[in-house]
Amino acid sequence: MRKVKSARKLGRTASHRKATLANLSTQLLLHKRIETTEAKAKETRKHVEKIITKAKKGTVHAQRIIFKTIRDKSAIRELFEDIIGRIGDRNGGYTRIIKLAPRYGDAAKMAVIELVDYAEMPAEQPKAATTDRSKRVKGSKKKAVAEGTSAE
């Protein structure tokens, strides 16, 4: 009897989806926080939580299994040396998804996925607010306006 698969397709072929999740997982392990669409963040969460749980065993066998999906040695080194040490005795729930405003170009639902124990890391600095240039009056216009009101 046919059963429904629980994973999202993300509008990709199976190989493309597998590569996308591997890349997102690698970047999350390296940078501790990434911004992506909400659907990709939810799938990445499932993927990364399983990887971290396997890595907590700390065996060579666990490293080899994880290396099948995450093909970046620096990410695996970071996982086994730094991330596992910070996680400690936490039983699951290693990641957090924070929803953001929709993306400007296509209104896609955006989210930030981050490792929970790295939340105190400084977020990207917000860009300086730009002034509204439509309200500014240039010097020559100021003089003309001032002269026009004083003449009346």
UniProtKB/Swiss-Prot annotation:
Matching InterPro entries: Ribosomal_bL17, Ribosomal_bL17_CS, Ribosomal_bL17_sf
Assembly, per entry: Part of the 50S ribosomal subunit. Contacts protein L32.
Biological source species: Prosthecochloris aestuarii (strain DSM 271 / SK 413)
Name of the protein described by the UniProt record: Large ribosomal subunit protein bL17
Region feature Disordered, mapped onto this chain: 124-152
UniProt cross-references to Pfam families, sorted A to Z: Ribosomal_L17 (PF01196)
One cellular component (GO) term of this entry: cytosolic large ribosomal subunit
BP GO annotations: translation
Keywords: Ribonucleoprotein, Ribosomal protein
Classification via SUPFAM superfamilies: Prokaryotic ribosomal protein L17 (SSF64263)
UniProt record similarity statement: Belongs to the bacterial ribosomal protein bL17 family.
Domain of life: Bacteria
Gene name, Swiss-Prot/TrEMBL: rplQ
GO MF terms, alphabetically ordered: structural constituent of ribosome
